[in-house]
Amino acid sequence: MEAIDMKYIDQARELWPELEWIKDAGLKEKTTNTWALALQKSVLTPEDLRTIPFTLLAGPDLKVSFMDHKRAVVHIARDAGLKCGEFFRTDLPVNMDVLIAGAILADVGKLLEYEMKDGKSVQGKYGKYLRHPFSGVS
């Protein structure tokens, strides 16, 4: 595995306070390291992620940032998992660590897909050939 600079691990932790919800230390570390590696390979900075729109498909008027959207998704996923546990208990158990990690990792590939051009996020050359659902898995 490629060495990850500690700076990017710190950035991932700062972007994702929800990592603390993951109790499994190994899964928390892998989730953090995946984000850190994506940050290390990306042209996008943490500040870019706090300001760029969460999708390129909605047009220039969209004001919801990538990180606001992503963190909301993680909170909604966690709430849904807790509610499933409340209703289904042991009949349909929810692995909350896996649920939270999956929600955090869902769009990590966008860090490789997007580039900044004239202060705006655009789909980069890499993203034209391999979109984020696939690059995020790799």
Spans of model-derived segments:
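Acidic/His-rich, divalent-metal-binding segments that scaffold phosphate/diphosphate chemistry
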Residues: 1-123
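Divalent-cation-assisted or electrostatically stabilized phosphate/pyrophosphate-binding catalytic cores
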Residues: 120-138
